[in-house]
Amino acid sequence: MILLAVVAFLFALIGAGFIVRRLRGHARRYGKDLPQRFHMGHIPRLGGLAMFASMVLTVGAAGLQNWWGYYSNALHWNTWVLYFFIAMLPAVAGGIAEDMTQRMTVRYRLVLTLATGLLAVYLLGMTVPRLGLGWLDALLSAAPWLGMALAVLAIAGLPHAFNIIDGYNGLASMVTVLMLF
């Protein structure tokens, strides 16, 4: 798994480097008066594309490891992995479209992340079965659809919450990593 983490880092580094170097021309269309433009030069806003491509390539590398017989317990290809990527597609496509056009409304992006949440619940069985409070756990047990609704709300809401926090300087990534551990 350490090797896969290193491979994922390298894929992300190479992908982000490629995007920054090769797609500068696209970044010229971003208005210079926007509050996000505090850096010098033209920097494209397609980091999500590099991260998604890194995930796909890393899972592919893990599949090759298994196929070649190395580290057979690293990651097993199954329908869950395929469903995971299918569930992510609406949110990823919306993020890339927003980065490319800067014309998507927040409502439309929220609909796409809600679609991702619904797909995650449907395809992956994501739910919130318990919260650690007896009375609330009893309610979630009696009405499992509430746990599904909470999962959809979390999947749809967290990216927007972190985007609001992140806003201008990109410092929310470390806060996100610490919170989700």
Residue ranges and their predicted role:
Residues 1-181:
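"…together with the soluble PPM/PP2C metallo-phosphatase catalytic core" -> "…together
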